[in-house]
């Protein structure tokens, strides 16, 4: 039987022939294409013998394998069709089935095999008899792709799996085993054996290593079964190799992918079906000159430090930058590495699982800037710079289309800028120390300012004046000016031939090399010579850093604008500190010093300026002026108080009708298309028509949308405010740091065209320039600031006839959106209060934004504020170093976006010690009915608040030794809630401070001559809405809303302090209110605060003699070291005078009425304690710790002024006690810091937020973070996470200290602002939380996530100043204690805020559907979350969209903290109840009280750790 079977099988095998062509080796004959025909050779029968024995089941294996091998072949179909049509083959297969079944049935094998013949065609099987026919079955010819003949070995009784021999290609791809040589020989013998008359048609290689398989395994091998038992257990080898052997390598997806990726392609391109331009998206372009991005500023370098940090990354609108040569002694500008910022650097979200976020390094000194250090590059001489530029040019061309990514994602491509410097270091040729630059601007620059940049300038090339400049160190070209670029292509701009677009100081600033991909050159002048011997102390360097610090918010710098004459305000701002950093050796830095402009001629920017040798001397530096040490210029530091970021009006201009439309509050015009028309307006249904006037749409917006009230008590339009503010780069940078709302696209937000109504906003620009070049004559007297710098000052008699006329014209011409740059000729800039557009149509709500006139100021504030800057002012700023970087505010504002204007005005919290503040005098606004009372006794000052014409006698006129009346609000504004001050006391606000030097603003008579000038009174009905009484409409009462309590909340920090010292001359000449002011009398032994009852005019200081001015310290050098109090005054010797700060909780400091106000005047030692009768909270506490109401005069020199006030009627007007002025300038006189009580919280310790403490905490936090990194590198993850979390807590603590000063502004000198610090800290806390989760420390993770929530909510709080107002609204609503609670409950407002009833009230007041929140089960069960929701939705929808990212992060942190907490609960033991209670308390704690939260967190950590080690 065995022999017969073998014989039959051999015959069957030999009967198979391959007729045709075969490809490849015999073992893989014709696998890929039909190479021939298969036929069953008729060799005389299947063996001639009998029966079933002639049919060997192994033939079935052969056939099966043929099928299986060809299963995935394209020949399979043809093969099956051919086989199925052949009867003989059917007979053979039927016989095989019967023979093969031998004891195995389909039932036994299971349905998965589908009956053994499931692989066969469904033809009727032939009876067994046919299969036993003596004649062999002949397989008809058919195409075959490949064969897999398997011949069993002689020793094997059962079927064996024989592996097909594959061609070389399959061997290479799938690495299949090949038979050993013995196997090959053996198979060859098998093929050649047999009857000689029969020749083998095919050569078969058999793998003798295959294991024996049962029938089920065979079927499984055919792919008919995926059962692991058959395919894996029975034949592990087959199961592993089967997929490989059955797929064609070129048809498998994996194979295709391998072919795509493993073969090198010429050019390094990836073989991919994707378009090449799509693949390029993966590539990141790098700035060509990145390696030159350059050195951190050196403490010894004075000039560069001022500008080195201003990079295009900070200001997204760097449309163009020009390459400047760097001087031998100057350092290259370096680009701070920004964290990404979304803003915040688009902070890595807390959900981000990436690497540990890098928190910006915070400098050891709080005043120093901590931009991440970039690799220092060598200083390049002029020649070296030229060579480098030439070398760079080629790469610039190559990188022409590359994106130079800065923070603002500004896309710019410069082909090349070739700078040639001619003997820049040669003073003989250039006596001014200026380098003549011939800048060949190859204008292949394609500037694309992303929408986020906020500066797609719409202005036409003839309106370049309106084009804002993003940073002081950057030149900007409007994309719209491409035409002018083309015209100027290849044009050589000579320093003498083109008006300077930068102040001489500006020339010094380095242009950011990386963001524009170009190198920078400093053309300021012989910086090497000037810097020689002018080393700046470390303190100065840190102060520089302070000013240079840039946050990478997508916010453009709001404080810099390009002046119409091409000057860049930003650069002027750089020198805000009394030109401390000016090259004082240059007598006058005139326009000869030409900043190679970015190819735009002066015409481009000034709308047709003198292109010839028209010289602009932005600032004349007195050569004799001493370079005051930074230590003595602390006042300037204070003057650089950062403008608080406040909701600003966003405007959009219709491209069709050229009409400006006010956007709803919170809506950013960046979201609008570049081409915008009135018809696209959707927020005012039915008013999307160009036929409607601007006023109509504006009024509609005012009516429909709640106008955010100035948050920091800063009158929005304060000219002085903005002017001084704008003057400092610090302010500009700080504004960015504060995360002010992004300026809307320049195309949408630029001020209305200058000549919109035929009025030239800069009619006197040329005249001003000429005046600057020529010395001031006639009316102007030179005022020497303590810094030794001189400024021209108009000794004008403040008759506002001209001012009023101009102002009316401006209003008529609807230049409301512009700053009025045409102040009266005789009005010095320092007295100019507000240039912002007073809205004739806007309601009072709108008023704060457009005018510095507080509602109380009524009609009068405007003239002084509107036209304050006169030509004399221009000369002052332009020609005097004393202005220290003060740029011409008129020019500034005209070029600023409306939103920027508003912000600047709003953020002008820092009173500038420069002329504007040096000469600040108290502007007292008299009520309308009391105009007649302007006559003042020489020693008497009538402070009229209401119709009650009450006068306050300055019984003890305090003699002022050497100080002019300077109101100096210290950086303290930053530390204290400016919004409260400004909100409550717009007059006391910084803007008002600038308007009213002392913040002491008595109401003016509505009938005063200047009252007619103001348009603020025109919309009385709207004003009425916000006023409590008509009297208040003209009183100096603060800006009012319908809710009086609302104002009270903001009044908490009305600590405005003013030195009210009137010079004896002015006192004697008290007849003219306009001349009267608060000044320090130099001749007397006692400082006598004289409150002059000037009308709305800002008192100019005519009374001061030149000599007096020289003696007087205008606070230019005053040190505002009282961060918490914000007011510090130094005498001539730089000694700090006592600082007096008052917090008036009532609407105003009682000036009239029943309350008697005794103000202690400063004694010899400068000790002054204000005593207020209005409220206990109004008492100012001195840092000395003495009782606020007690004054202990040292020498009996303290004099009291009795001021009777009626708090109820005088809401809003506050007379802050005059700052004490040191009589002798004794060094012993120490400045005393006063802390303003916060309404909600106890007064913060005076030293809590001092730079020393904050700096120490920052250093500790940074060191801990670095230690954490090192530990993590060593593998100690848990300890690393613990230390990192400790660093987070310290960062939060520092942020809370900074927060104490002012909610909407960051500390003036701080290297980082509060918002950014909170954001970065939240990111770091998120990292710590994820680490704790990974380490299964769920309690710690819950605490870390809580910190994430707090940090991001605080960041959102700071990013949107409107939160302040809404927060106060929440607090006001919370005043009504819930049932069962007394109003005097010890529960804080924050706790009340979390009360469900309070939330419901607030939500309803904000127009939200309370029912929606009530229906939320989470809200109902989680009061804390409801508090967050109330806060989040306390804005209108547009504001909500802006802050959605931060709030999302905060809520994510809340959710994860709860999740981690529950995970912790699931694994704790009973003895850990204390830890649970503390943890619960922390998680439910409000984010407002950061310090309290930190204490709870530390306590909770101690408890958790203690329980862990029990």
Swiss-Prot record:
One GO CC term on file: nucleus
Effect after changing residue 676 to A: Abolishes binding to histone H3K4me1/2/3
Amino acid composition bias (Low complexity), ranges on this chain: 1003-1016
Subcellular location: Nucleus
Alphabetical list of Gene3D superfamilies matching this protein: 3.30.40.100
Chain sites annotated for binding Zn(2+): 654, 657, 678, 690
Function: Binds to histones H3K4me1, H3K4me2 and H3K4me3 in GST pull-down assay. May facilitate the recruitment of effectors to mediate gene expression.
Protein name as it appears in the record: Cysteine-tryptophan domain-containing zinc finger protein 5
Provenance organism: Oryza sativa subsp. japonica
